[in-house]
């Protein structure tokens, strides 16, 4: 099956000034799109051509896996942000976060520290473990919880291309802004349910 670049779940300028239209033009329009194009080219005439994106991620390796995982990760990441985002989670997810970390503030501090400390290019995830608890997990360049027993709830992209246009080399400022103004807790809560 041919994969398509998923549209953003909001207007390209909807997250400005915290995430600019220019950042989306490069991050979504060029980087994310390149993963889609590469995946389509790499899977041609292989067993993966008839599989869903999730099946490809779970069964492939090398370039096909890297591009498939990056397509999925980016599509997921766009939904982790929303216009006028921020705030704190509620309900069962808030209870799980408080149960694991003691408070939302302690969770946020741990997540920011983990994301800032994620060496090189990668992703920092809030995941639901098989036992129903939550945890923070760092993955490398194309890592994704889809290949584990964890369920992705929320992620922040810490590849430099994710934040360099708006934040230059200030990854901590980007991650702090993600929580203050962009995070979509409703999406994470729906994933937790």
Per-region residue spans from a language model:
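Feature for soluble, non-membrane regions of globular proteins
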Residues: 1-193
